[in-house]
């Protein structure tokens, strides 16, 4: 009996330790998911907040401050929605894109014939943002399933030809409940619409959240 008891005690302690480790692991995983979810909702809320502002679609070239530069508050294009939403959660895409582009200019598109970076406009071009997000490992799967596009995700579309577009997935559902809505500016200002699958998706990203 004296030989059996220590064995039982050791097994009991080992079992308790395993349970405690599993509980700690479970709580840690849940905490990580909760943190990610919170950051996604923060970006989603930032995008929704932008829909309260009156903005005229204006693709003009503007000379802006750096860092944290922005075009006039009453103007903007699709990329400005993304830039402004990220800036509200402390991420300056103007600065981040410029730094990355400066470090490896040859990896970015040469669509506009530029030979060097331009802090006023580089971050305001969809192909540049797509390249930046991909280089940062933020690329996600492109699918035709609405549940794959979570609040805070960035989606890029091809509207036809060489015309590209970008918007933010937000925490609002379509009327049929099958997909999240999009905050974007396709010409009518910073608006909330059910348009996820209205155009051909060419990019899906989850960056900084």
Predicted segment positions?
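...with weaker cross-activation on analogous glycine-rich loops/strands in unrelated enzymes
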Residues: 39-44, 102-183
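Second-shell loop/turn segments in exported
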Residues: 36, 64-73, 115-119, 140-144, ...
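Low-complexity, Gly/Ser/Thr/Pro-rich intrinsically disordered linker/tail segments
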Residues: 179-209
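Hydrophobic h-region of N-terminal signal peptides that target proteins for export
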Residues: 26-34
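Sec-dependent signal peptide recognition
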Residues: 18-24
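Sec-exported extracytoplasmic/periplasmic mature domains
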Residues: 48, 52, 83-91, 98, ...
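Active-site-adjacent structural segments surrounding the nucleophilic cysteine of cysteine proteases
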Residues: 34-76
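Acidic helix-start/capping segments at beta-turn-to-alpha-helix junctions
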Residues: 59-79, 92-116
């Amino acid at each position: 009996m004296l030989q059996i008891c220590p064995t039982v005690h050791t097994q009991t302690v080992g079992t308790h330790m395993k349970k405690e480790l599993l509980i700690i692991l479970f709580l840690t995983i849940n905490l990580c998911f909760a943190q990610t979810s919170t950051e996604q909702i923060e970006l989603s809320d930032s995008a929704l907040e932008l829909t309260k502002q009156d903005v005229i679609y204006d693709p003009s070239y503007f000379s802006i401050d750096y860092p944290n530069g922005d075009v006039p508050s009453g103007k903007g294009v699709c990329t400005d929605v993304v830039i402004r939403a990220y800036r509200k959660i402390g991420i300056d895409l103007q600065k981040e894109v410029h730094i990355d582009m400066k470090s490896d200019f040859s990896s970015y598109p040469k669509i506009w014939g530029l030979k060097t970076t331009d802090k006023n406009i580089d971050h305001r071009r969809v192909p540049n943002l797509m390249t930046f997000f991909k280089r940062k490992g933020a690329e996600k799967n492109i699918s035709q399933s609405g549940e794959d596009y979570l609040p805070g995700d960035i989606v890029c579309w091809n509207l036809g030809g060489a015309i590209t577009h970008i918007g933010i997935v937000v925490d609002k559902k379509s009327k049929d409940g099958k997909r999240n809505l999009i905050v974007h500016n396709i010409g009518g200002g910073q608006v909330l619409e059910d348009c996820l699958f209205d155009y051909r998706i060419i990019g899906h990203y989850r960056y900084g959240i």
